[in-house]
Design a protein with these regions (language model features):
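Flexible, glycine/proline-enriched loop segments at strand-loop-helix junctions
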Residues: 103-104, 128-132, 159-162
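Glycine-rich phosphate/nucleotide-binding loop
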Residues: 103, 124-127, 135-140
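Active-site/ligand-binding-proximal alpha/beta "capping" segment
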Residues: 88-123, 130, 181-189
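A cross-family phosphate/adenosyl-ligand binding-site feature
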Residues: 1-96, 134-174, 178-194
Length: 194
């Protein structure tokens, strides 16, 4: 299975997030999966890829040219794909992935999450989408989306399209399972994304 991991590139975060990314990379490789990532060597991105490789895993990095130019590209990736920009990068990562795992991250990670989550809610794909959130960083996001539902901006099944987990083991159990498809009716399509 090709598992795409969305995660942080910030150098200012607590070490526990980097350690979590490394644990995920090692576990991904141990289970025989291929890692698809943002193709950078820094922070959580670097930790997940280097740990996956150290555990014998295959890594595919997808990085825009602008980040290659500032020398953060993971040139040790088994396959490094350089894109013209960020939108193309997300498209390639999406196309190359059978499942998606979201680790704690910043607004770039949120952008990636929302694109894949929205496509799942709309029934465009039925691949597993999992958030691994051991320390509750994304809990305000869950509350925000619940509030949006309470106000009528989303359907209740918006949470059927995603699995919220707190341990690496639980995250992989969801990544390796086939989730139920989310199939909105035509009447619901306008409600799917607000």
């Amino acid at each position: 299975v090709n598992i795409c991991v969305f995660c942080a590139s910030s150098l200012r975060i607590d070490r526990k997030y980097v350690d979590l990314a490394a644990e995920v990379g090692a576990e991904l490789a141990r289970r025989g999966h291929t890692l698809v990532s943002g193709g950078a060597t820094v922070s959580c991105m670097g930790a997940v890829t280097s740990a996956a490789r150290a555990a014998g895993g295959v890594t595919v990095g997808v990085i825009p040219q602008v980040l290659v130019d500032v020398e953060v590209a993971d040139t040790d990736s088994d396959e490094l794909i350089v894109t013209a920009g960020m939108r193309e990068r997300k498209g390639v990562m999406d196309a190359r992935s059978d499942a998606f795992l979201v680790l704690p991250g910043g607004i770039g990670t949120l952008e990636e999450l929302f694109e894949i989550w929205t496509a799942r809610v709309l029934g465009i794909h039925d691949r597993p989408l999992v958030i691994l959130d051991p320390w509750g960083l994304y809990e305000p996001l869950r509350q925000l989306v619940s509030g949006m539902h309470a106000e009528g901006f989303t359907r209740a099944d918006v949470f059927d399209a995603i699995s919220w987990t707190t341990t690496v083991e639980e995250a992989f159990a969801h990544l390796e399972a086939r989730p139920q498809p989310v199939r909105p009716s035509i009447a619901e399509l306008g409600e799917a994304t607000g």
